[in-house]
Amino acid sequence: MLNPPLNQLTSQIKSKYLIATTAAKRAREIDEQPETELLSEYHSFKPVGRALEEIADGKIRPVISSDYYGKE
């Protein structure tokens, strides 16, 4: 079972693809620098789970550049 639930994650970030890429980037950061934790308590022991918890809590947002939407 996914914790946090997918509907809680999609309330913060609408795209499942952006959730996955944002969580992966943040998980790498947590793995390389464990002292960068943003929450006082985590339910997950793994970096990806911790990243998903941060997304669900609204601590992490993806940075979308203007070229993502085809604008220059």
UniProtKB/Swiss-Prot annotation:
GO biological process, one term: DNA-templated transcription initiation
Keyword Nucleotidyltransferase: yes
Keywords of this entry: DNA-directed RNA polymerase, Nucleotidyltransferase, Transcription, Transferase
SUPFAM superfamilies (UniProt xref): RPB6/omega subunit-like
Gene Ontology CC annotations of this record: cytosolic DNA-directed RNA polymerase complex
UniProt-listed Pfam families: RNA_pol_Rpb6
E.C. code: 2.7.7.6
InterPro entries for the chain: DNA-dir_RNA_pol_omega (IPR003716), Pol_omega/Rpo6/RPB6 (IPR006110), RPB6/omega-like_sf (IPR036161)
GO MF annotation terms: bacterial-type RNA polymerase core enzyme binding; DNA binding; DNA-directed RNA polymerase activity
Catalysed transformations (reactions): RNA(n) + a ribonucleoside 5'-triphosphate = RNA(n+1) + diphosphate
Name of the top EC class for this enzyme: transferase
UniProt record similarity statement: Belongs to the RNA polymerase subunit omega family.
Quaternary assembly: The RNAP catalytic core consists of 2 alpha, 1 beta, 1 beta' and 1 omega subunit. When a sigma factor is associated with the core the holoenzyme is formed, which can initiate transcription.
Role summary: Promotes RNA polymerase assembly. Latches the N- and C-terminal regions of the beta' subunit thereby facilitating its interaction with the beta and alpha subunits.
Protein name: DNA-directed RNA polymerase subunit omega
Natural source organism: Staphylococcus aureus (strain NCTC 8325 / PS 47)
Record lineage: Bacteria, Bacillati, Bacillota, Bacilli, Bacillales
Protein encoded by which gene: rpoZ
